[in-house]
Amino acid sequence: MSDETFVITGAMLADGSRTDLLLAGGRIQETGVRLSAAGATVVDADGLLALPGLVDLHTHLREPGYEQSETVLTGTRAAAAGGFTEVFAMANTSPVADTAGVVEQVLSLGEAAGYATVRPIGAVTVGLEGERLAELGAMADSRARVRVFSDDGKCVSDPLLMRRALEYVKAFDGVIAQHAQEPRITAGAQMNEGALSGELGLAGWPAVAEESIIARDVLLAEHVGSRLHVCHVSTAGSVDVIRWAKARGIDVTAEVTPHHLLLTEELVSGYDARYKVNPPLRRSEDVEALRAGLADGTIDIVATDHAPHPVEAKDCEWDAAAFGMVGLESALSVVQSSVVDTGMLGWADIARVLSATPARIGRLAGHGTPVEAGAPAELFLYDPAAAREFSTGELAGKGVNSPYLSMTLSGRVVATFHRGYATVLDGAVLESVGGARG
C-alpha cells in the first residue's frame, strides 16, 4: 500500500474530459476539480493526457542468465520511462523459465525492483527445445500464477506438441503465445525476402514462413477450443489469416510491435544492425496492412518485443549481429507517430490496445482499468504535443540498440505512477521508488 499522496491537476483523460486526480493509498481516491489534500505533492498536468498504465505482453528482461544485456531492475526502469506499469517477461532466460522455481524467481525480482509489476511468461517446452512440454501446470499453480506460455525466439513447430500445449493450458484458461516462424523455411535468413534482399546479398526471410504457422495454429486452436495469441505479426498475409480466423469465431488474439508499424526493409540497405530484428522489417505494404489491422481490431494489441543486447552484439557485421531492438522507452511515441498522428486511432483506442486488452489477454486483474475514482493508481502522464530527437539519454535500461536514435518522435512521458508511487517525474526515472518489496 502506498503512503504517498499526489494531486494531479488539469489532466485530460482518454475521452477528452479534464479532471484533477487524487492519488493516495495506492488508488485513485477522487476525481473532480480543485482537489487538494494535506501534504500532497501537486503535479501540474495542464496539456497532459492521463492514461492507464501501459501493459506490455512481450518483454525480454534477460534475467536470470543474461544480466550483461538487461536485468529485471533495469528493464522495469525502461518500462517506467515509457509509461508501462506492468510487463510480461519472456521465458528465454538462463535457466529457461520452464519450472515453477524460475518463474517465481522472476516474480520476486520484479517485486524487489518496484518500478513495474512483472509477470513471468512460462516456456511451452523444456529448455525451449521443442521436444516435450514444460511444467505448465506447476507454473500455473505457482506463486507467479503463470497464464501466458511462449517459446518466443523459437517457434513451437511440431504440430502435435502445439496441439498438446493448447489442450493443457485450456484447463486453467491459459494462452499459448506463438512465435510464428517455420524454422525450415527461415534457416539462415537475415532480412525480408524480396528484391531488396537479393540486391543486398542477404538471405531472405519469406512472409509465408510466418503466415503458414499462423494458419496451422488457428485451426489447431479451433479444433481444441483453446486460446491462441500470435506474437509480433509482421505481414499483410498474416493479417488476412487472422481476420479470417476471427470471422470464423476462433479464439485468437494478435500483437504488432511499434517497429513493424513504422519501419520498413529499406533501412537494412545500410547494413546497420540496429535494424536487424526477428521477424524482420517488411515492405511498406505490410506496414500499411498492420496499421489497418490494428485500427479495425484484427490485431488486438501493441507489444514492444523489447530485446536489449550488449553493444558488441550489434556493433559488428550484419550476419553476425544479434536479432532484436529495445523498445519500451519509445513505444508510445512510435505508436503515436504511426497511428494517432495519422488519424487511424484515438487516445481511447491507445488505452485499449496498450493497456486494457493486453491485461485481459494475460488475465491480469487491477491493470488496464480506466483512470477513474476507485481504480488502482496505475497511470501515467503524457504530453502528446511534445516532439524530440530520440537519443541514448532517454534509454533507461542497459540496451542502446534502438532503431530510433536521431529520429524525431512525437510525444513524451512526463510522469508514471505504479501502485500509487511515482516512478517517473518531470520526465526522469526516479533513482529509488517506494513500491519496491522484498
Swiss-Prot record:
The keyword Cell cycle does not apply. It comes from the Bacteria. It is an enzyme of class 3 (hydrolase). Its EC number is 3.5.2.3. Signal peptide: none annotated. This is Dihydroorotase. GO terms for molecular function: allantoinase activity; dihydroorotase activity; zinc ion binding. The keyword Acetylation does not apply. Catalyzes the reversible cyclization of carbamoyl aspartate to dihydroorotate. InterPro entries: Amidohydro-rel, DHOase, DHOase/Allantoinase_Hydrolase, Dihydroorotase_CS, Metal-dep_hydrolase_composite, Metal_Hydrolase. Belongs to the metallo-dependent hydrolases superfamily. DHOase family. Class I DHOase subfamily.
